[in-house]
Structure formats: structure tokens, C-alpha cells
């Protein structure tokens, strides 16, 4: 870790600084007067349930230094993901499954060797991770929801828990490939999170460390003025440039 990254972490202790680079040069771009319910609540069953659900402040800021967008009002550990069923999404949709198959095939054909150790953070129902079972028998998934359908996937070593940096204490084999889909936007300290992956990953034969990340595109949100995409569930709103800044700062 370089000196600048250490300074960044110290600066981020100030809640008014950027959560990636630590800069205090930030500006609010979206701060509605009304508080928002969590988007994961979906539709409530009754009118009274809708009125009584918890609501949260949303103050989206942009960092002038690294260009990252984030919710300044987000409180760490304010959302629990361990008490809900995972809706990994469209398991019975042919189009969605075809899309997942194409994505997995691209990863297998271009990045993986036989018997690589694959780790997925926030693996949901395990459908995507299971698509690599024809390439390796070492598939490890972390998913905090105890109601995940992943328990039915015998090909996967499942941990019904949040992923923590002490992963190496529980596994003899270091991962060769890490997958994280629609997780990073929920993480309150993304730089430390990505640095953890860099330190635990094995290098491939090209001396590369491989990390696959999917996040919602804030570029599309900004291009279409779609401010409904700003809600409390997401700490971060990544653009291509801010995500690149993050993973480069972490050592990749």
C-alpha cells in the first residue's frame, strides 16, 4: 500500500470526505427534502405498511478529485442483508439465463484455467457461480441471506455470511478469480474492500490478478437525468472513470 492510500484512509474518517480518495473537495448534486424508504422493500402489502417503513436521507455528492459519486448521508451497517430472501433475479427467464450463460462462457474462455479457485462475493442463489462447475470443482460463495436457494447447489462451498478480510483464516487455497456482481455499490469503504481482494488473489501465468466487478452504470443515470436511480440502498454510484480510479488505487 502506498503512502497516498494511507492518507486517503485517514481522510475518509472525516464523514465529509470522498469515500474513495479521501478528498474534501466534494459537492452535493442531489439532496431531496423528503426521506426515502429502502428500494429493496419493493411493494408493501398495505397502505399502513408503506407509511410506517423506515426512511432515510439521500445526499448524493461528487468528488472533484476522483469523480466518484456517493451518498454522504449513508450510515455504515444501517442495512442488514441477512434477514431477507435473495431475489437473484429471473431464474425462470430464458433471456436472463441465456445472458448469464454468455457472460460465464466469456469468462471461462478468456480468463480461467482448469481447476482455478473461484470466489464469488454476494453469490445470491448461486446460479451464476454454478455455471463454472464444468471448469473447476473449487467454487466458494459468500451470501448473507439464509434463505438463498444456494443451499441446493452441491457444487459450491457456501458460507451464509458476510465476506470479511479474514477469509484466509478459513481457506487453505487462495482464489484465482473473484466475482462480485452488484455488491460493491453497497460497500461503505470500497477501497479497503478491493485492497483485500488484491492481497488474497493468486496471480495467473501472466502475473495478473483477476477480479470481475459488475455495478450499475452511473454514466447512464447522468446521461438520461434518471435521478430515480439515486436511493439509499446504494452508497456508491460508479462511473467508468471512478471505478477505474478505485481498482487502480487498490493495486490492480
Identify the function of each model-found stretch.
Residues 2, 14-92:
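N-terminal juxtadomain amphipathic helix
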Residues 26, 104-225, 235-252:
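Conserved SAM-binding loop
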